[in-house]
Amino acid sequence: MSHNTFGHLFRVTTWGESHGPALGCVVDGCPPGLRFKLEDLQVWLDKRKPGQSRFVTQRREDDLVKVLSGVMLDADGETMTTTGTPISMLIENTDQRSKDYGEIARQFRPGHADYTYDLKYGIRDYRGGGRSSARETAARVAAGGIARLVVPGVTVRGALVQIGKHKIDRRAWDWDQVGQNPFFSPDAAIVPVWEEYLDGIRKNGSSIGAVVEVIAEGVPAGLGAPIYSKLDQDIASLLMSINAVKGVEIGNGFAAAETSGEDNADEMRMGNDGVPIFLSNNAGGILGGISTGQPVVARFAVKPTSSILTERQSIDADGKNVDVRTKGRHDPCVGIRAVPIGEAMVACAIADHYLRDRGQTGRLK
């Protein structure tokens, strides 16, 4: 299986499976001289790890990251400095239950990658989905922690803005609320609504989709290039690579189809300090594939996980019709833990474009 690497200068290769002994990543192209502590990475993995509320999978993983290479340890025994060589990171799997998947060893779960993996490769890891499992994204979040160190002054934050048909009130957006509830919601009022709604979903053994929004602030103007190296193109590509993602939009996205040219174009004026001021940000901080200096705004939709208790029709590897019921521990709404994953992907895209821009223009933004 190829294509386990993304990025141009800031390159990330992930490895490992859901029920293997461990998974991890190698980050190549990270500049030397960046200083950090393990806790600077662990905070993002703790945000993604399973088992933190009744609304996510009850698989218990500590997701403790180990940095194996690419750094030198300071005298304090905690601070690490990147050397510019590949940074290898490892996360152990400790709570696999492969026996839960014995019945589907030869059955294709509807809506999963089982059929297409088997069709393409002639073999698949049925234990939790192998590489197609969202367990792989723990390694991406670790890589995203490194990416956040690359571009000075950039803050990447995400929030859950919709579960099923229940949307947040955007007028109530408060970043301080995001870390205060199990949904990463910026709207405190929607939390009890989501709790009641998801409790019903869980009780029925079903699942539901969601929308995640990621905003990157402090992004330097000038990142990205026209035509085939657009910043929004690469952000969309990385977000689409996340498990269960079925749609991505930048800025106003699909809502722009209902907007007039007068309302959609972001008008500009010159500020008193000689720096242009945008009067709106419908473009999501990117014009012509190049960052404007405004916040970069992206949203992505995740489908309901196909791992549900309802019996469904499918086929098996012998071409026979079968009825499949998925066992195991699964997220009733994968959008919750997709928040830190989306943050990591956007951070990696921005870090890569920052290094590419520096190499092409020589500018240190």
From Swiss-Prot:
Pathway: Metabolic intermediate biosynthesis; chorismate biosynthesis; chorismate from D-erythrose 4-phosphate and phosphoenolpyruvate: step 7/7. Its EC number is 4.2.3.5. Reduced FMN (FMNH(2)). It is an enzyme of class 4 (lyase). It catalyses: 5-O-(1-carboxyvinyl)-3-phosphoshikimate = chorismate + phosphate. Gene3D superfamilies: Chorismate synthase AroC (3.60.150.10). GO terms for molecular function: chorismate synthase activity; FMN binding. Transmembrane segments: none annotated. One of its GO terms (cellular component) is cytosol. It comes from the Bacteria. This is Chorismate synthase. It comes from Rhizobium leguminosarum bv. trifolii (strain WSM2304). The lineage of its organism: Bacteria, Pseudomonadati, Pseudomonadota, Alphaproteobacteria, Hyphomicrobiales.
